[in-house]
Amino acid sequence: MSSSSRPGRASISPFRSRRTSAAGGGAGVAAAAHPPPARTSSGGRPSTPSSSSSAAGGGRPTTPSSSSAGGRPTTPSAAFARSTTPSSGRPTTPSSASSRAAGRAPPVAAVDAANAKENIMVTVRFRPLSPREINKGDEVAWYANGDNMVRNEYNPSIAYAFDKVFGPATTTRHVYDIAAQHVVSGAMEGINGTVFAYGVTSSGKTHTMHGEQKSPGIIPLAVKDVFSIIQDTPGREFLLRVSYLEIYNEVINDLLDPIGQNLRIREDAQGTYVEGIKEEVVLSPAHALSLIASGEEHRHVGSNNFNLVSSRSHTIFTLTIESSPSGENDEGEVKLSQLNLIDLAGSESSKTETTGLRRKEGSYINKSLLTLGTVIAKLTDGKATHIPYRDSKLTRLLQSSLSGHGRISLICTVTPASSNSEETHNTLKFAHRSKHIEIKASQNKIIDEKSLIKKYQKEITCLKEELQQLRRGMMGNGYIPPTDQEDLVSLKLQLEAGQVKLQSRLEEEEEAKAALMGRIQRLTKLILVSTKSSISSNVSGKASLRRRHSFGEDELAYLPDRKREYSMEDDDVSLDSEFSVEGKLDSNNPDESLRFDRRNRRRGMLGWFKLKKSDQLSGLSTSVDSESTASGSPSFSRSSQQKHPLLDLKDGRRKSMTRKGDDPALTDSFPGRTQAGDLFSAASRARHHLPSGTTIVDQIDLLQEQVKMLAGEVALCTSSLKRLSEQAANNPDDSQIQEQIEKLKNEIDEKKSHIRVLEQRMAQSLETTEDPAIRTEMSQTFSKLSTQLSEKTFELEIMSADNRILQDQLQAKVSENAELVETVAQLRQEIDNLLKTAKNEDNVASMQSSEPSSTSSNPRDLANEVASHSKMPSRTTEDHTESPLKSQVLLQAAEIENLKLDKLRLAEEKDGLEIHSQKLAEESSYAKELAAAAAVELKNLAEEVTRLSYENAKLNADLAAAKDQTRSSIQSDTKRRDQENGIFVEELQKELVASCQREAVLEDTLSQRARRESELLKVIEDAKCHEHDLENELANMWMLVAELKKENSQEDLFQFKATQNGYHSSKSDTGRMMSGMEASDNRNWDGVSVSTYEEAKAAYNVQRRRCKELEGIVSRLKGEDLRGLDVKVLEELQNFHVEALSKICQEKMANQVL
């Protein structure tokens, strides 16, 4: 790029998504639109950006992620639809393929999804240039070239291809739909999934994963999607558990449980896990998001040069999903999967200029991210033998995911700024390496508890049948007197031991069955099912027993609609439009803006969901909000403060939060909803279809939680009512305050009635308890309540002692204050007296001074004389000594000044004492309120203790009756066993005789079998000897055949024809012989041939007889039941010998013919 075009880059928009510079002319655009395939070396490896840029003479860009010339496509999306040019088989990038004309569309080769290897899905998201970067003069160094390419502005030859590249204007909803939705859907089907964001600090990782009010992140969208899938899946039951942890300075902390610090990583057959991590069962999106918000409160954050609120730790939000078929005739398969949503801390360079603790945190963050990069490099290398998972806690926890067990989606967040060009390049290299990791996603299935129960039931039935068969067999055998008393006793002991063992095994199986049934019943209430399966049953009026816990559309309505994120014109629907201008903080104050950002960041995931609810106190004025929150009761919990965000403000900083609160009609038409009210309404709605496996204790626990929530809301409304009453006393003519007071009173009465209804339901549940197991649980609950009662009593005693001490201190201060008031009054009287005396003395002095003035003729001379007296005291002392009256006046004036100072000091002390007494009065009133509340709670606990003691007495009576019944049944069982023992001894004797007979028969059978086996072994040895002889004779015959060949090679003289045994011989024509051969010579040759034929015939007959013998032996062996002999081997030997003899005879005939 020429230097003349660089000055124009200062005006580049931060939302720029592709290079549009005209300096390069048409060649640059063509290169960007049609990048050529990658250049490969001789070994077929893809070229790096540096090598490709140095090798390309014309500056043609290459793709680093491309493979060899005839190999795989450049992008993972091309694994499913690969584009090839007609001239060569080289793959092209999706940008080049999309830019081709429609008429020249290349052929598409479909790849079977079952056989294709699946890789990690890697996406890149650009954030826009920040105002700080724009003010600093940064330029766009990296940009998105199409939907799958990232290019460098200064070196177009450096380009990377990924599954998807998101520009700066892309919404988080769009990122979730492409990068994370398939992972969430797979997790709901039993496939483990992991989604994590990677990038440098201040690149937008936390914004992508958590989001804000206007644009929710991946985690809240995934939570919404999970519950939406459950709602759309009426055929399955789901159980959801969540855990939330952070890795801070290589230490694992539990964010849901602040006590869980420095946890350890363990490993079992299923993979790695964190020991002692807290898991919460969630029932709704609100519940899950509230847990995330509470976990964010404990996460470590800090500030650096790039970000005011920077994440200083890695966080892992794990959602464990269990699902099973909801039908009764299911196969018992349970799918178990984990969805890990990870927000990594950003890598830091020296540009952050951190010191002290921040530098230490950055070193740990860089170390873990470096280990993650090393592990990914080792995984993609293919030659590495050791992968350093244990070098970092992060890679240790990600070992199962990086090993390929589940789906992984990597979202790399990058900044296009030129000042971070090197960091962005490193992030792209990391993403490029991660793309080559292969994964094998498969469903995780476990055996359901119901199937285990069926298995145990079948096994118990089989054991009982075996026991019955054993007893029937012992009863069926005849009686034979025992031959030996010792054998009888030993057999009896063995049978008793076997019976005891069998009985204990049956008891263990029954206990295991009962434990599993109890676990199933306790977990039934935590199972989530869709409400779509119960529509028809609700219409017909029949209660569905399969419905555990369901959530409706009102729960999902709190979350923003998916379609809202696709359009940028729906800002009027967003929550920011509901905030008034007065509620915004002053951006000029950096401290308040920092606190505002931090508060918004922590509540960002719940703010957009909670603010959808209309506030029950939206009609309150600004002064009421500020006063009620500034002096709220300290007994309110943090959860109650989170439920009412309008009451969380201090000093009136936030005014009216919604525009709906300004209109009283809207306030009346949309009454406020609270969490406790929702729970109460849900409990009242579900009263007719309680779950079949829910125990009384679980119901009581749920009702107690609802009562606690309602009590907190009642306390909050009472505090607001108190503030409004004070305002009404000051402004009795304000009708709006009176209406609000009436509303609050009605709401308090309604909540109290709800509390009474819940307490009545708890009492009814306790009265209808008849199950012994539930009674045992009630006794345990009673012991816990008694312990809590003792603790509360102790705390109350401590509070009363503190109250007495405070009252004593208050009385002492009041007495001191009274003494000080008396002292002040006395001092005032003394001051008045002194002032009166001083006035009198002044009058006397004036009278004395009037006498010399009358003697003087001129007043001016008298004034000059007085002035001279005042200027020259020595002169006055010489003329006249100072009178004692004037000295007294001066002393009294000094004393008056001291008294004035003492008066001011005493006034200040009085004000301080009044303030202190006021504080003590407030503390005393607060202590009285606490004492009253404690007295009420103590009264309730006493009533509950009396009720539980009554129940305990009932249980003790039932237990005594059960013990008496058990004792009587044991006595009857002992008598019956004594009667059965006599019969059992006779049965044992019979069984002993029958076992002796069976042993004798078995010994005879074994001896006969041993003899037969010995005989068979002898026969086999004989057969082997025969086989050896046959082999020797066969060798002799081959020698004979060789001799015959030598004799017949000289001349073909004779031909023989054998009429017996199928042999033929004839004399050959003697026309070719010499005319001088005599007949005697012919006779001699004829004799030799006849003798050779006779020998061959004899040998053949011998071999034929032996073959018949072997056939007879084989047939006899086949007729016998001999499992130890190999009949096939004997038949193969027989066939071999027959073939050998036939070949010998054929050779003989052929030689004779020749």
From Swiss-Prot:
InterPro entries: Kinesin-like_fam (IPR027640), Kinesin_motor_CS (IPR019821), Kinesin_motor_dom (IPR001752), Kinesin_motor_dom_sf (IPR036961), P-loop_NTPase (IPR027417). GO terms for cellular component: chloroplast; cytoplasm; kinesin complex; microtubule. GO terms for molecular function: ATP binding; ATP hydrolysis activity; microtubule binding; microtubule motor activity. GO terms for biological process: microtubule-based movement. Keywords: ATP-binding, Chloroplast, Coiled coil, Microtubule, Motor protein, Nucleotide-binding, Plastid, Transit peptide. ATP binds at G199, V200, T201, S202, S203, G204, K205, T206. The keyword Coiled coil applies. The keyword Electron transport does not apply. Its main location: plastid. Residues 119-437 form the Kinesin motor domain. It is found in: Plastid, Chloroplast. It holds the Pfam family Kinesin. Residues 1-109, 620-674, 838-885 are annotated as: Disordered. Residues 441-523, 734-761, 801-845, 894-967 form a coiled coil. Residues 1-21 form a transit peptide. Residues 1-14, 29-109, 628-640, 846-857 have a biased composition (Low complexity). Belongs to the TRAFAC class myosin-kinesin ATPase superfamily. Kinesin family. KIN-7 subfamily. This is Kinesin-like protein KIN-7E, chloroplastic. The lineage of its organism: Eukaryota, Viridiplantae, Streptophyta, Embryophyta, Tracheophyta.
